[in-house]
């Protein structure tokens, strides 16, 4: 068994990172892609490893030769790397392909060692590694039958996302038997390159072979094993979070993304609290039915959205504004004072992060078993001279809940002390008590009482970025509205 690595490409989409080096010289977690791949292959007792190089090949060859790889290394240089595609690079290695069984892989991949073992352990002669297609994946896909035979190869331009659950993405790691290479793949490779030219992809040859229905090449499906194809800066950023060996560092890199966790299929999110029962299928169908209109036309402006929000919550549109998620409204509200601001911790940190260190007055509830009442809050802040009090109710992450009677009393206490009270009830729909403070019976109690609510949590639509701010002080709401975008 030998390995052939295609490493001639320029990697233009990686910008400055490939200005003086080819794509496989990019580092992930401090290790270059090519080194990671070669170290894995070096442990598999292969007869040789052949690299087809091109762009910046001197740097690449010098680096590879410095690694001390025990397996024999050979190089083939593609001198026209800037005028050809990977079908030409592979054709340069066609004579080597027919001399031995071959592991074929592309150099812009990062993958765990288990992927290579799966191919080597599988008794079938010729295999393509595939993974279940996900919406962010790019490139050629396959359709498979129940016996893992390749029914069709689907080019990127021909993908139909309504059929996404039927697709398998090629990992771009293959095992070709010598017999398959000599009598099937290489002859078709020669013919296809001659007919179509050198600016094509070697996967097109596999598609032709699949159409013959000889079932010589089958698929080996992955089941959660890690891999990533690195084409651009975003891919590199994701790979950094997937392939770091330091668990704490991995946690930091993933949480710093603040979402997009669908790219981590095994991740279980205990942080972002979203209603798992919404949206309903009927609601999703309505969104899908209107998606063309929603995407291709300008939406209604802020004035209309305020009308709709007021109708939804049963209050005047003058008492409510809508933001790009609650986060946008939180930032604006926290800038309304330069004085001291009271917080009950641990809590949702977006509020704390929006004010200066010297403004923060913290009521730490760790010694209270994270349980506190409205009276506890009054007692603690009575002599603290705060100008604003922030309360998340129910709180996140403690889950502490202050009932409506205590909230009523807290509003009156803040009014007496002339303290601006911000109540975040984004999680109130998860509590036993159904009563919301976004109602005239509460808002009319005090000019400086405001309620913030994230629509994401209760309705299960965090991607829609909707939050509301309600209060009696329409002058301040209008002032904040003027700072926000029209849409």
Describe the residue ranges of each PLM region.
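N-terminal "arm"/small-domain region of PLP-dependent enzymes with the aminotransferase-like
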Residues: 241-297, 385
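Conserved core segment of the aminotransferase class I/II
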Residues: 149-154, 445-487
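Conserved N-terminal catalytic core of the sugar/cofactor nucleotidyltransferase
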Residues: 2-5, 31-102
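Active-site pre-lysine segment of PLP-dependent enzymes
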Residues: 118-122, 372-385, 397-461
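Short loop-beta-helix segment that forms the pyridoxal 5′-phosphate
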Residues: 298-299, 310-332
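N-terminal nucleotide-binding beta1-loop-alpha1 segment
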Residues: 1-19
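Conserved core of the sugar-phosphate nucleotidyltransferase
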Residues: 112-196
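PLP-dependent aminotransferase-like
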Residues: 335-392
């Amino acid at each position: 068994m030998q390995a052939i690595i295609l490493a001639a490409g320029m990697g233009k989409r990686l910008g400055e990172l490939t200005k003086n080096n080819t794509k496989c010289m990019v580092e992930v977690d401090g290790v270059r892609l090519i080194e990671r791949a070669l170290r894995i292959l070096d442990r598999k007792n292969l007869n040789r490893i052949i690299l087809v190089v091109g762009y910046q090949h001197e740097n690449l060859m010098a680096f590879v030769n410095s690694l001390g790889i025990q397996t024999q290394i050979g190089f083939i240089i593609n001198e026209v790397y800037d005028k050809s595609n990977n079908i030409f690079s592979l054709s340069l290695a066609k004579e080597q392909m027919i001399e031995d069984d071959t592991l074929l892989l592309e150099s812009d991949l990062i993958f765990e060692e288990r992927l290579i073992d799966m191919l080597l352990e599988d008794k079938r002669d010729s295999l393509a590694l595939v993974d279940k297609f996900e919406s962010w994946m790019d490139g050629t896909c396959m359709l498979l039958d129940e016996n893992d035979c390749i029914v069709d190869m689907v080019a990127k331009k021909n993908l139909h996302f309504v059929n996404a659950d039927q697709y398998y993405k090629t990992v771009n790691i293959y095992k070709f038997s010598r017999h398959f290479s000599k009598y099937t793949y290489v002859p078709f490779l020669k013919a296809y390159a001659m007919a179509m030219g050198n600016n094509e992809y070697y996967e097109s040859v596999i598609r032709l072979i699949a159409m013959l229905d000889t079932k010589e090449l089958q698929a080996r499906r992955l089941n959660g094993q890690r891999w990533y194809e690195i084409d651009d800066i975003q891919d590199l950023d994701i790979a950094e979070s997937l392939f770091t060996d330091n668990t704490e560092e991995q946690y930091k890199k993933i949480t710093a993304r603040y979402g997009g966790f669908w790219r981590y299929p095994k991740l279980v999110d205990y942080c972002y609290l979203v209603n798992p029962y919404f949206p309903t299928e009927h609601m999703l169908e309505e969104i899908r039915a209107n998606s063309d209109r929603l995407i291709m036309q300008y939406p209604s402006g802020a004035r209309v959205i305020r009308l709709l929000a007021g109708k939804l919550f049963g209050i005047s549109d003058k008492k409510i504004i809508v933001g790009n998620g609650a986060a946008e409204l939180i930032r604006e509200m926290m800038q309304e004072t330069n004085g001291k601001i009271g917080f009950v911790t641990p809590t949702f940190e977006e509020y704390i992060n929006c004010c200066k260190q010297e403004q923060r007055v913290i009521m730490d509830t760790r010694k209270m078993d994270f349980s506190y009442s409205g009276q506890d809050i009054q007692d603690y802040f009575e002599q603290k001279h705060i100008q604003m009090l922030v309360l998340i109710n129910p709180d996140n992450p403690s889950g502490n809940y202050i009932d409506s009677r205590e909230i009523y009393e807290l509003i009156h206490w803040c009014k007496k002390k002339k303290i601006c009270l911000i109540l975040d009830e984004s999680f109130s729909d998860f509590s036993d008590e159904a009563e919301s403070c976004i109602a005239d019976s509460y808002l009319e109690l005090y000019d400086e009482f405001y309620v913030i609510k994230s629509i994401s949590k209760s309705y299960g639509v965090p991607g829609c970025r909707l939050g509301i701010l309600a209060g009696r002080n329409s002058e301040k709401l209008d002032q904040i509205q003027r700072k926000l975008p029209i849409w």
